[in-house]
Each structure stands twice: as structure tokens, then as C-alpha cells.
Amino acid sequence: ESMKDSKYKIIRNLSGHQLQPWDLHSIKSVAVFETRNEDILEEGDALAVEIFITDGDSWINSSNKALIYALTRNLSPVRNPNVKKLQNDIFKRRKTLPFTERYVLEHLGYSKVDFFLLKKTENLKEYPILLEKPGTKIAQFEDVIYVDKDKVIITTK
């Protein structure tokens, strides 16, 4: 409603998502626009309500490059001892929460080769860079809500 008279448009193909322990992008989604999404909110659900706006076309595409990663829930065995140690160190500190290559290099002290080899396993989920038209501006706003028995609580206010 507040966007009607603005030069900015809501990005139509991005949505909010359910939050669960160690899983920031869980099963249920929170649409910004009316959709055929039939996810039903239940008591105890925690959700990130995200709105992205742009002065571009209001449609995002995924690039083929990722800068954010997360360990998958079901880790396959890793033979290389350095990569296995790296994977274990990430899991000990981050579980399945997102992280960057810079975190691995600067905070954990591993090499680019170790991280490259970890990326070659099936144990990393990649979050691709989201693209709009070149030169456009994008902004994001997010609130977290909790569905209680009788009401919805906005936890980020």
C-alpha cells in the first residue's frame, strides 16, 4: 500500500521464509503478493517476513556465482583430512547457518585450496548472487514474527 506512489517497486519473485533452529531458510514461505502458496501458519512457527524493493524491473534472477554457503544437513563422508577438519570446524561453529569464504580464510585460518575442495563435495549449499538490471538499486527490509496461540508477535521491534 505505501509503495503505490513511490518510484520503487516490490520485487515479486522473492519471499520470506520459515525459521527453524540452525535453518534460516526452512520449509514454509511467506509471499509478499497473493500467490497459490498454501502454507498454513501454525502455533510455534517463526518466520522472516522479507520485502525487497527496487527501482528496476521488480524481478530477480540468480547468477551462477555464490558468495554465501551453508553446510547441508546430511553430510557425505570426506576423505581429504584437511577438508574433513574444515567441515568439522564449520559444523562445530555454524552448524547449518550461512557463512562466507572470507570467514573460512580469516576466522578459521584455512587455505583457499581447502575451501575449493570443500566446495567440490556435495556438502555445501550455495546461495547464488541475486541480480536485477545493471545500475538498479535494491533495498531489503525484514521483520521476524512468531505465531503464538492467540496472536502474532513481531520479535524485531
Regions inferred by a protein language model and the residue ranges of each:
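Active-site neighborhoods and metal-handling regions in enzymes and metal-associated proteins
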Residues: 1-157
